[in-house]
């Protein structure tokens, strides 16, 4: 427990924007100084006239523990021997304008449960991890040519107790982890878990970037959750919001009486969410945010970050009209400082940690998002494919009668599928705000809704890119996601929902064992069209190949409720073929149409290929075929 007084070097790096572990000296740190145990408090408030620590240890009396300014650094610090782990505290900041602001600690490791807002003194080095095998494996493990199945979760509404209370991190470590493992997913992506005051923000409007939310337990409890994930072969990705923060009075807004974390000009500070943008002209903001990203990897052993609202970082005019934004120094709308920040962030994370996932939620056509900075890119290694998601859902929501007129919605994503490293997301954003659940989006009668959804999931598994599905989609949640309650697990008492869940489970396991579906996710050789042109019957046929091209799987998707008998497709080899997966099986809720016998090849050329086979295509179905090695 060495002292935590900020050193000259710490302060220098912090003010340069290049201290990437600033949480080690800012905030509240239990330690020993001059033979006394206590807590060292340090905070950056350069424009304050005076800063004091108030808390449960001094009866919230600001006169007892004033802080000392370290030279002209803007950092205030003090050691309080009466303070200890678990104590509540805030900073009482006297501004140069004569008013007083009561603030929670930007670097606090824990916070009171809402609606209370005090920070809590906490030490994060007491948990004994049991994930060494997982952490060692990451050193040599890259996901690019591996299967990635992400289950996206909001911890507060996956499941609730009978009395409506949240499940705790430790309860989730048992129930959720066991469920995710059984379903065949190998990653959990959590909606933001840092402390936030408003449940309705789903965690995206933060006040405390270093405090895991106390809604579900303590920091050790969350470490236990991640530890349990790793012990069960499941990686953890956190949703992270570095672009903007909550306006609540106890948070970062006007922290020392001046615009410190946010730009002073409201045209730069305001955004469409009624939060405040970070000021990326401030190097200390870089230190704060990059340190925060490092913090989650370093302290909590996470495996990746999904970076929210990257478009808002890239563009000064994102979501704004004329006169509501300020051009950059060249007169353009690019946020030059934020772009540099993103590149530096990714560079640091890839230097500090082995094989992390850095995933951009970016909806514009910004180029080279998943290329390294030295090649002109932003430095992420994955990007959500919002174009695929929008086009696919627009297509799937149409009555099957009209799909033939919009066939391009189905095929266009294959034109740019290798332009970035993509994740195919069916996320929380698509099942809220009147958009309806995935199942309810599907057209047709009750049976057709399920058949359409099975077809969509099968098509998604065949399409190049890693996969993400929001909780509830796997069993056909019928109503939209509601953060105020758990999912409708009672639906599993109904046959079609149970069969859909079984389908998703078996599809996940089929995908994970079939190398052709993921080894070539990011290489031209990993995909080959057989027939993209059958718009009249709303059928597409394509091949996925393994890394060296020695093996392949043929995928056929039928987006109408018509059975197609004796449907001929071109094949590359004169071999027998076998149906290996079919979304229309009765056990999945389908009609039971299948190719039950070995399919014999024909020397009749078809689809510009030397050979062909005739198959039965079930109604509203995705089917997978493999050649038999002879």
From Swiss-Prot:
Q: Glycosyltransferase: present as a keyword of the record? A: yes
Reactions the enzyme catalyzes: Transfers a segment of a (1->4)-alpha-D-glucan chain to a primary hydroxy group in a similar glucan chain
Q: Which GO terms describe its molecular function?
A: 1,4-alpha-glucan branching enzyme activity; cation binding; hydrolase activity, hydrolyzing O-glycosyl compounds
InterPro entries registered for this protein in UniProt: A-amylase/branching_C, Branching_enzy, GlgB, GlgB_N_E_set_prok, Glyco_hydro_13_cat_dom, Glyco_hydro_13_N, Glyco_hydro_b, Glycoside_hydrolase_SF
**Presence of the UniProt keyword Transferase in the record:** yes
Gene3D superfamilies assigned to the protein according to its UniProt record, in alphabetical order: Glycosidases (3.20.20.80), Golgi alpha-mannosidase II (2.60.40.1180), Immunoglobulins (2.60.40.10)
Which pathway is it part of? Answer: Glycan biosynthesis; glycogen biosynthesis
User: Can you tell me which residues form the catalytic site?
Assistant: 308, 361
A Gene Ontology cellular-component term: cytosol
Give its E.C. classification number.
2.4.1.18
| GO biological process, any | glycogen biosynthetic process
Top-rank taxon of the source lineage equals Bacteria
> Which top EC class is named for this enzyme in its record?
transferase
Q: Which Pfam families match?
A: Alpha-amylase, Alpha-amylase_C, CBM_48
Q: Which UniProt keywords apply?
A: Carbohydrate metabolism, Glycogen biosynthesis, Glycogen metabolism, Glycosyltransferase, Transferase
The record ties this protein, via PANTHER family, to: 1,4-ALPHA-GLUCAN-BRANCHING ENZYME (PTHR43651:SF3)
Q: Which family does it belong to?
A: Belongs to the glycosyl hydrolase 13 family. GlgB subfamily.
- Subunit structure, interactors included: Monomer.
Cited function: Catalyzes the formation of the alpha-1,6-glucosidic linkages in glycogen by scission of a 1,4-alpha-linked oligosaccharide from growing alpha-1,4-glucan chains and the subsequent attachment of the oligosaccharide to the alpha-1,6 position.
- This protein is called 1,4-alpha-glucan branching enzyme GlgB
> What organism does the record attribute this protein to?
Halothermothrix orenii (strain H 168 / OCM 544 / DSM 9562)
Encoding gene per record? glgB
């Amino acid at each position: 427990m060495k002292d935590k007084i900020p050193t000259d070097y710490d302060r220098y790096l912090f003010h340069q924007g290049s201290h990437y572990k600033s949480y080690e000296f800012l905030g509240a740190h239990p330690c020993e100084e001059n033979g006394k145990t206590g807590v060292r408090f340090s905070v950056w408030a350069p424009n304050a006239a005076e800063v004091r620590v108030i808390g449960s240890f001094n009866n919230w009396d600001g006169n007892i523990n004033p802080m000392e300014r370290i030279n002209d650094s803007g950092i205030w610090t003090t050691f309080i021997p009466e303070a200890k782990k678990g104590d509540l505290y805030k900073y009482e900041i006297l501004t140069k304008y004569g008013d007083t602001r009561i603030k929670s600690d930007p670097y606090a490791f824990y916070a009171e449960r809402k609606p209370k807002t005090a920070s809590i003194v906490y030490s994060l080095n007491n948990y004994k991890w049991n994930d060494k095998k997982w952490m060692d494996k990451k050193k040599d493990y890259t996901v690019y040519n591996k299967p990635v199945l992400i289950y996206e979760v909001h911890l507060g509404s996956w499941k609730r107790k009978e009395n409506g209370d949240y499940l705790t991190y430790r309860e989730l470590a048992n129930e959720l982890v066991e469920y995710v493992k059984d379903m065949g997913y190998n990653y959990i992506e959590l909606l933001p878990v840092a402390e936030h005051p408003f449940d309705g923000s789903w965690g995206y409007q933060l006040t405390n970037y270093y405090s895991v939310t106390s809604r579900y337990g303590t920091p050790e409890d969350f470490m236990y959750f991640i530890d349990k994930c790793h012990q069960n072969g499941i990686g953890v990705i956190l949703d992270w919001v570095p672009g903007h923060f909550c306006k609540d009075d106890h948070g970062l807004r006007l922290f020392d009486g001046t615009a410190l974390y946010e730009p002073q000009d409201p045209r730069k500070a305001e955004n469409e969410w009624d939060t405040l943008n970070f000021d990326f002209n401030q190097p200390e903001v870089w230190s704060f945010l990059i340190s925060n990203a490092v913090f989650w990897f370093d302290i909590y052993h996470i495996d990746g970050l999904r970076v929210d609202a990257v478009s808002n970082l890239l563009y000064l005019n994102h979501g704004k009209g004329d006169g509501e934004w300020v051009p950059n120094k060249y007169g353009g709308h690019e946020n030059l400082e934020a772009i540099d920040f993103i590149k530096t962030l990714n560079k640091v994370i890839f230097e500090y940690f082995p094989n992390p996932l850095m995933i951009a939620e970016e909806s514009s056509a910004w180029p080279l998002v998943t290329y390294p900075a030295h090649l002109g890119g932003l430095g992420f290694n994955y990007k959500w494919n919002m174009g695929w998601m929008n086009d696919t859902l627009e297509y799937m929501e149409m009555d099957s009668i009209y799909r033939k007129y919009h066939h391009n919605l189905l095929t266009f994503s294959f034109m740019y599928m290798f332009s970035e490293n993509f994740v195919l997301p069916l996320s929380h954003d698509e099942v809220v705000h009147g958009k309806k659940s995935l199942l309810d989006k599907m057209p047709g009668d009750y049976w057709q809704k399920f058949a359409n959804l099975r077809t969509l999931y099968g098509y998604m598994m065949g399409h190049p890119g890693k996969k993400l599905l929001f909780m509830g989609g796997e069993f056909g949640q019928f109503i939209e996601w509601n953060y105020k309650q758990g999912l409708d697990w009672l639906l599993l008492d109904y046959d079609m929902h149970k069969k859909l869940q079984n389908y998703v489970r078996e599809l996940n396991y089929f995908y994970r064992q079939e190398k052709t579906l993921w080894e070539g996710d990011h290489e031209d050789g990993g995909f080959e069209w057989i027939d993209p042109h059958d718009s009249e019957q709303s059928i597409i046929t394509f091949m996925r190949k393994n890394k060296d091209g020695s093996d392949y799987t043929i995928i056929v998707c039928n987006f109408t409720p018509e059975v197609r008998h004796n449907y001929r497709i071109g094949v590359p080899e004169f071999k027998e073929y076998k149906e290996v997966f079919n979304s229309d099986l009765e056990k999945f809720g389908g009609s039971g149409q299948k190719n039950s016998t070995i399919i014999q090849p024909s020397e009749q050329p078809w689809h510009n290929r030397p050979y062909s086979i005739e198959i039965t295509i079930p109604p509203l179905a995705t089917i997978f075929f493999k050649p038999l090695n002879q």
